[in-house]
Amino acid sequence: MNIFTEAAKLEEQNCPFAMAQIVDSRGSTPRHSAQMLVRADGSIVGTIGGGMVERKVIEESLQALQERKPRLFHGRMARNGADAVGSDCGGAMSVFISVHGMRPRLVLIGAGHVNRAIAQSAALLGFDIAVADIYRESLNPELFPPSTTLLHAESFGAAVEALDIRPDNFVLIATNNQDREALDKLIEQPIAWLGLLASRRKVQLFLRQLREKGVAEEHIARLHAPVGYNIGAETPQEIAISVLAEILQVKNNAPGGLMMKPSHPSGHQLVVIRGAGDIASGVALRLYHAGFKVIMLEVEKPTVIRCTVAFAQAVFDGEMTVEGVTARLATSSAEAMKLTERGFIPVMVDPACSLLDELKPLCVVDAILAKQNLGTRADMAPVTIALGPGFTAGKDCHAVIETNRGHWLGQVIYSGCAQENTGVPGNIMGHTTRRVIRAPAAGIMRSNVKLGDLVKEGDVIAWIGEHEIKAPLTGMVRGLLNDGLAVVGGFKIGDIDPRGETADFTSVSDKARAIGGGVLEALMMLMHQGVKATKEVLEVA
C-alpha cells in the first residue's frame, strides 16, 4: 500500500493519523531516511526500520494524536541512558511526528439559508461539515461545499442520534420551528460548543422550559444563545461571519475583541470590583465590553439572590456565565491575571482587598452596596469609585454613582454623597415591598423551587429552618438565596416578579446597566483628566 495514497484517503475522510519522518540519524540505525503512517488504532503503513525504535515511535505517534499536537522524538539504539529505546545498534535518530486528519467537525442542525452560508464559510476555515434536515429538498448538494456530509431524517431528534456527535464537535441548531426538539437531545451531551440561532425572547422561553424539565444549570450554562458577535449582521452571509467568529474564539481558546489598540484610553487596564452581586456584575459587563480587564472580589459565602445574573455564583459553582461572558473562581493573583488574558472575569474570595498590592489595578470600584463604607479608601488605586450611599466623593473616593431609581439613577457625583436609600424596592406592576421575600427567623436556607420557576401566591418556595416560606404573590421566581446559607431574621432571601413568564431572569437589569454606564463615564473622565490628591480633598485636575 502506498503511504501517500493512504494519507490522502484518510485526510479526505478526516480520519486521524500521524506521519513519522526520520529527520536525522547518526551511526548504526535501521533506516536513515524513511516515513511511516500511524493510524489512530496503532496500525501502520510503511516502516522506519522496525524493532524497538519503531514501537517507541508508534507509541509517541498515538500520544501526539491524543494531544492533537506534533512532536519531535529522539531515540538512541541503546539499553541505558537518556532516550534509550532498548536495542543494541549503537546509533541514534530523530523523528518528526505530525498529526493529520483532525479537522474540527461542525454539525449544522437545519439546512436553511443561514446554515448554508455557514457551511460555505466554514469549509474555507478547514471544518469537517455535517448538515441534517427533515426536508430532503433543503439538502441539495449544490447548496453546500463538495465534502459536506448531508443527512436526511424523519425528525431532528432522529437526526441528532444518527450524526454520532462527539465531545470535540461544534454544533449549531438553526431550524425553522423545531429547535426545541434538537435542543432537548443535545443540551446534556458533552460538546465542545453548542449554539442556538434564535431571538432573545425564544432563548428565554427555552431556558425556562429546560429548567422546568429539570435540566441542570451546568448543562444550561453551556448553551451559547443568542449566538454570534454583535456586528449588525442581517444577511445569511453576515450572520455566518458573526457565528463563525464565536466558534473560532472557543476553538482557539482566544479572548476575542479587536486586534487593534483601542482608540479609547482603557488600554485593557485592570479594574478591581468589590462585590460580585447582580449590580456589580452589570458594572463588570459594562467595563469588560469597553475593553477593561476586570477582577471581582467577594466574601466566602456571597448572599446574592439574583444568582443567574451575578458573577458571585462562581464562588459556589467554580464558573458563572452572564450574557455570554464567563467568570471563573481564582485562588491566586497569578491565576487571576492569566484568566483575564484568556478573556475571563476572575472572581476571588478577598473581602479585605488584601491582594490589591499584587494586582495593582488602575481602578477600584466598591459595588458591595452595603449602604456603608466597608473599608474602601481613595488611595486604593489611581481611580476609586463607589456605588450608592455611605461614601463621600472627594473624601472616601473620587466619584460616587447614584443608585436610587429615578431621574438621577447612574449620575456621577464628584463631590458629595448619593441619595439615602429609600428602602422601597422597584415598582413592578404595582408591587414593591410585597414581592420581596425575607426570612421570618434565623436559620438555614433550603429552597423548594428554582430561579425561573412560575409560582402561585401561597406556594411553598423555601424553608428557613422549620419555617415555611410562601410566595407572597403569583409570578416568576427571579431571586433566591443559595441553599445552605445561614441567615438572620429579616434577611432578604428572594423575590417574585409579578410579570410571570414574560419576566427575564437571565439578563442584567436596566438598573445595573444604568449604574454600569455611570461607572464607565466616571472612569473614562478621571482617566482623561487625572486625579490630583491634596491633604483633605481629592479634586479633578
Swiss-Prot record:
Q: Where are the transmembrane segments?
A: none
Pfam families in UniProt: XdhC_C, XdhC_CoxI
Q: Which organism is it from?
A: Escherichia coli (strain K12)
For this protein, the record's InterPro entries field holds: MoCofactor_Util/Proc, Se-dep_Mo_hydrolase_YqeB, XdhC_CoxI, XdhC_Rossmann_dom
Query: What is the protein's name according to its record?
Result: Uncharacterized protein YqeB
SUPFAM superfamilies named among the record's database cross-references: Zn-dependent exopeptidases
The taxonomy runs:
Bacteria, Pseudomonadati, Pseudomonadota, Gammaproteobacteria, Enterobacterales
Tell me the Gene3D superfamilies matching this sequence: NAD(P)-binding Rossmann-like Domain, Zn peptidases
